[in-house]
Amino acid sequence: MPRKGPAPKRPVMVDPVYGSPLVSQLVSKILLDGKKTVAQNIVYTALEGCRAKNNTDPVQTLKRALDNIKPSLEVKSRRVGGATYQVPVEVKPARQTTLAMRWLVNFSRERREKTMAERLMNEILDASNGLGASVKRREDTHKMAEANRAFAHYRW
């Protein structure tokens, strides 16, 4: 561990088009090989598609989707006396958002639609309706935490 303590949290910049830090965070998660313009085009096209399909504010749709994906519990491995236990722990708000974004992007990449913008748009729309692979991932995480509830007293 560093002697100077943890690195300070940097503020997330707001997005120039939508004025939302969530959108700029999503752009950063989509980013590959430093091609930020490509990532921005993907996200903006996906959000415009959400607006066209739902006739609602795309940032609100994204927020609703992320709220449906955010996990409240997860399991962490803890070694006690030669045995490794999966200990359920609560997830901090910043990590909830990070995990939700990561799952949204990863499961978007696995979808079968033609372009990444289409995949992202459909995953956002599915998640905002409580469907999709990313919401299933959250449910699986919660089930795992519930199944290992007996080891909750090993929390640190």
From Swiss-Prot:
The keyword Acetylation appears for this protein: no
Lineage top rank: taxon: Bacteria
GO BP: translation
UniProt keyword list: Ribonucleoprotein, Ribosomal protein, RNA-binding, rRNA-binding, tRNA-binding
GO CC aspect terms: small ribosomal subunit
UniProt-recorded Gene Ontology molecular function terms: rRNA binding; structural constituent of ribosome; tRNA binding
InterPro entries: Ribosomal_uS7 (IPR000235), Ribosomal_uS7_bac/org-type (IPR005717), Ribosomal_uS7_CS (IPR020606), Ribosomal_uS7_dom (IPR023798), Ribosomal_uS7_dom_sf (IPR036823)
Classification via PANTHER family: RIBOSOMAL PROTEIN S7
Reported function: One of the primary rRNA binding proteins, it binds directly to 16S rRNA where it nucleates assembly of the head domain of the 30S subunit. Is located at the subunit interface close to the decoding center, probably blocks exit of the E-site tRNA.
Family indicated by similarity: Belongs to the universal ribosomal protein uS7 family.
Quaternary structure, from the entry: Part of the 30S ribosomal subunit. Contacts proteins S9 and S11.
Name of the protein: Small ribosomal subunit protein uS7
The species this protein was found in: Cutibacterium acnes (strain DSM 16379 / KPA171202) (Propionibacterium acnes)
Protein encoded by which gene: rpsG
